[in-house]
Swiss-Prot record:
MF terms (GO), sorted A to Z: DNA binding; zinc ion binding
Transmembrane segments: none
Alphabetized NCBIfam families for the sequence: recR
Record SMART domains: HhH1, TOPRIM
Entry protein name: Recombination protein RecR
Keywords of the record: DNA damage, DNA recombination, DNA repair, Metal-binding, Zinc, Zinc-finger
Residue intervals of every C4-type zinc finger in the record: 56-71
GO biological process: DNA recombination; DNA repair
Gene: recR
Length: 199
């Protein structure tokens, strides 16, 4: 264990997802040996992100303005809405270049064990978006794990009375995996082969 601010830095870096103690230590010593201008730039960017980035008022994706670039793009198909758990999932699907509709970011998935229920997600906002009848197809692109499946089933049942076609990404994605780790080809095929959910 180190003393003072270097240990504080290691501890803070270790709180980041995917960064274990060894990685945190390696990053801390990289920062320590880096040019002060690089470190200053990193600090500025971190602060800038916290100050300038917000969530899109429409879909919940990350944005620098009130609307994200996807919601602001009139070329996107407003009749197809893809529901994802997190903004990183939007990026994963966008990389496929197969989807031309719009998104709705839930902000997570239903997970009773973690104390996350439907009221903790952006489901109310989703229903508001569906209310005007513009959306004809709702693609449920939640992660193919227990929480993602539970969320998809919940949403499918909730939306069924609205008469919107509800589909789920096709298989091919590994069960228990996260969308952000799927390669573009697999994710693209999953989008092409999506199926309707019968609940």
């Amino acid at each position: 264990m180190y003393e003072g601010v270097i240990q504080d830095l290691i501890d803070e870096l270790g709180k980041l997802p995917g960064i274990g103690p060894k990685s945190a230590q390696r990053i801390a010593f990289h920062i320590l040996g880096a040019d002060p201008s690089q470190v200053r730039r990193l600090a500025e960017v971190l602060l800038d992100v916290k100050e300038r980035i917000r969530f899109c008022a429409i879909c919940g994706n990350v944005a620098e303005h009130e609307q994200c670039r996807i919601c602001a793009d009139p070329r996107r198909d407003p009749t197809v809405l893809c529901v994802v758990e997190e903004p990183k999932d939007v990026v994963a699907i966008e990389k496929t270049r197969e989807f031309h509709g719009r998104y709705h970011v839930l902000g997570g998935a239903i997970s009773p064990i973690d104390g996350i229920g439907p009221d903790d997600l952006r489901i109310r906002e989703l229903l508001q978006r569906l209310a005007d009848g513009t959306v004809k197809e709702l693609i449920l692109a939640t992660d193919p794990n227990l929480e993602g499946e539970a969320t998809a089933t919940y949403l499918a049942r909730l939306v069924k009375p609205l008469g919107v076609r509800v589909t789920r990404l096709a298989s091919g994605l590994p069960v228990g995996g996260d969308l952000e780790y799927a390669d573009e080809v697999t994710l693209g095929r999953a989008l092409e082969g999506r199926r309707q959910l019968d609940v």
